[in-house]
A protein has these predicted regions:
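N-terminal basic/disordered segments at the start of proteins
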Residues: 2-50
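Generic structural signal for buried aliphatic residues
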Residues: 185, 250, 256-257, 328-333
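Short, well-ordered loop/turn sites that connect or cap secondary structure elements
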Residues: 231, 247-251, 324-326
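Phosphate/adenylate-binding glycine loop and adjacent helical scaffold
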Residues: 244-247, 328, 334, 345
Length: 353
């Protein structure tokens, strides 16, 4: 038998349950002294595991998982929830990956068993964790170095971030002014947005306005619920990890966060970015607890709107079009630290105006 433990592992691996299940960390003996492998870990209890043929056993020689190699449809058909006594199933998909993973998720959706997939890189692991929307229960990451483990940890951190509700602040509009022409950015996403959802945009990183999507119906133009008319190229946009980037830096494949009126967020992928010269309007606002002015420039068009605060249980009013925005109207802001270095918040003195 091959012992999978801190003292005798021949390949590094990490098993991570995406829905809060037990985390298993298997590392090479020459990785143990690497400080970065335990970065962020306060206390760890590690249970040695043993691989014997197609089974994984614990220290008491009890089977805790069964390993299945899958390279044909027939081998996939043999994996059935009712046939296995072990609580965990580990699949090694040697041929196709996406469709077999989806079939396994469908077959085990009402089962109490945990299904993990073996992967040798983070990109492959992401495929398994996102298959059929729900993903498999976890990953056994079989690697020779610690970097893919840290990459997978970063992926889980980003997904966990989606469960955190952002604190949005009410701000009162103090000035509205036609500004002239500029290069504005339309951000087209790979996901649809609902009324009340949009992207966090602003001229200053310290205050980002919640800019509504073009999901609302109009008599003159079809709704585009995948699009946010986001503002000029210089503006900041919120991206995962508490970071910002410039609108001009966005491109296909980048991730941004979609936020609703209540601060709930989700990570979405940018499908396309359009930059065109359009007339702009300047909107300035202040929050009651701060005398600083926070501003945003947006295209001067009826389809561009700022999300407003919830009014009690009234879910009908979601946004003010910039063309009908008035001084005194209330909009939603995300207030945060203003000093940034490559999009990362830092502590330093800065003046933005």
């Amino acid at each position: 038998m091959e012992e999978l433990s801190l003292n005798g592992t021949k390949t590094g691996a990490v098993g991570h349950g995406i829905n809060g299940s037990t985390n298993l960390l298997w590392v090479q003996s020459n990785m143990v002294e690497r400080k970065d492998i335990i970065n962020g870990i306060t206390i760890a209890v590690i249970s040695p595991l043993f691989a014997s043929e197609k089974e994984i056993l614990d220290a008491q020689n009890k089977r805790v998982a069964t390993i299945f190699d899958v390279s044909t449809p027939e081998e996939l058909e043999r994996i059935r929830p009712e046939d296995e006594q072990a609580p965990n199933i580990v699949v090694n998909l040697l041929d196709w990956q996406v469709i077999p993973a989806e079939n396994i998720i469908a077959a085990f959706q009402n089962s109490q068993k945990t299904v993990l997939a073996i992967s040798d890189n983070t990109s492959e692991a992401q495929i398994f964790l996102e298959a059929l929307e729900h993903g498999l229960d976890g990953i056994v990451l079989k690697v020779e170095d610690v970097e893919p483990i840290l990459e997978l940890k970063e992926y889980f951190d980003r997904r966990t971030e989606e469960n955190n509700v952002l604190n949005l602040t009410k701000a009162t509009v103090t000035n509205i002014q036609v500004a002239g022409m500029g290069d504005r950015v339309c951000v087209d996403l790979c996901s649809l947005m609902r009324p009340g959802e949009g992207l966090l945009i602003g001229s200053f990183a310290r205050g980002l306005f919640l800019v509504h999507s073009e999901c609302l119906e109009s008599n003159y133009i079809a709704s585009r619920p995948f699009r946010v008319n986001a503002g000029p190229v210089h503006a900041y946009i919120a991206v995962p990890g508490g970071r910002t980037c410039y609108l001009s830096e966005l491109k296909s494949g980048k991730e941004v966060i979609v936020v609703d009126q209540q601060g709930r967020q989700r990570i979405v992928i940018v499908g396309r970015v359009k930059i065109e010269s359009r007339p702009l309007i300047l909107v300035e606002a202040k929050i009651d607890s701060d005398n600083q002015t926070i501003s945003i420039l947006l295209q001067n068009a009826e389809t561009v709107a700022l999300v407003c605060p919830l009014q009690g249980n009234n879910l009908l009013k979601t946004a003010f079009p910039v063309t009908s925005l008035k001084v005194g109207d209330e909009v939603l802001l995300r207030v945060q630290g203003g000093a940034r270095h490559t999009g990362i918040e830092i502590q330093e003195f800065i003046v933005e105006k």
